[in-house]
From Swiss-Prot:
Interacts with unc-40 (via cytoplasmic domain). One of its GO terms (biological process) is innate immune response. SUPFAM superfamilies: Cytochrome b5-like heme/steroid binding domain. It comes from Caenorhabditis elegans. The chain crosses the membrane at residues 9-29. It is found in: Membrane; Cell projection, Axon. This is Protein vem-1. Residues 47-146 form the Cytochrome b5 heme-binding domain. The cytochrome b5 heme-binding domain lacks the conserved iron-binding His residues at positions 84 and 106.
Length: 183
């Protein structure tokens, strides 16, 4: 084997060299594009009971926070704005009581008025309960959805939180954290 056989240049060598040089050129000239900034974290809302009218302004358009009611509890689903934000899959639920819509799996079933959920079947209520089980472990609990302002509870300076298995009633009635307003 002489030295000239080591320096033979074939078509395969040419293709390989072009590919390697192409990658090298790309690596040298690529622009360093910064990663997109993570979405800004909004401060948790203070705990507060709301009427349907008050809840409506938290639809992701009028306010950056996205809230909706489910089984009488208000959840801050802002971190799920890819699902619940304006124009998204469940965007029609934002700012409303979503119990009937999630129970019936019909997004058009949201109401702009107080809904006492009469007419929901046991199966539909069970479906709504399953949604709530997921929400209370994933999203911040803001308070309760009440029919009128006289039913609101005072939570002091408490911020909304992920409550998990903790009952909202135990928070309202427990210790000095929450007392019923006298209006």
């Amino acid at each position: 084997m002489d030295l000239s056989s080591w320096f033979e240049f074939t078509m395969y060598d040419a293709v390989f060299l072009v590919v390697v040089l192409g990658f090298f050129f790309y690596w040298l000239t690529r622009s360093e594009q910064p990663l997109p900034a993570p979405p800004k974290e909004l401060a948790p809302l203070p705990m507060s009971d709301m009427t349907v009218e008050e809840l409506r302004k938290y639809d992701g358009v009028k306010n950056e926070h996205i809230l909706f009611g489910l089984n009488g509890t208000i959840y801050d689903v802002t971190r799920g704005k890819g699902f619940y934000g304006p124009g998204k899959a469940y965007g029609t639920l934002a700012g409303h009581d979503a119990t009937r819509a999630l129970g019936t799996m019909d997004q058009n079933a949201v109401s702009s008025e107080w809904d006492d959920h009469t007419g929901i079947s046991a199966d539909e209520q069970e479906t709504a309960n399953e949604w709530e089980t997921q929400f209370k472990f994933k999203y911040l609990t803001v308070g309760r959805l009440v029919k009128n302002s006289s039913e609101k509870a005072d939570y002091g300076n408490r911020k909304s939180f992920v409550r998990g298995a903790e009952s909202l009633d135990s928070i309202i009635n427990g210790g000095d954290e929450g007392t019923k307003k006298d209006n």
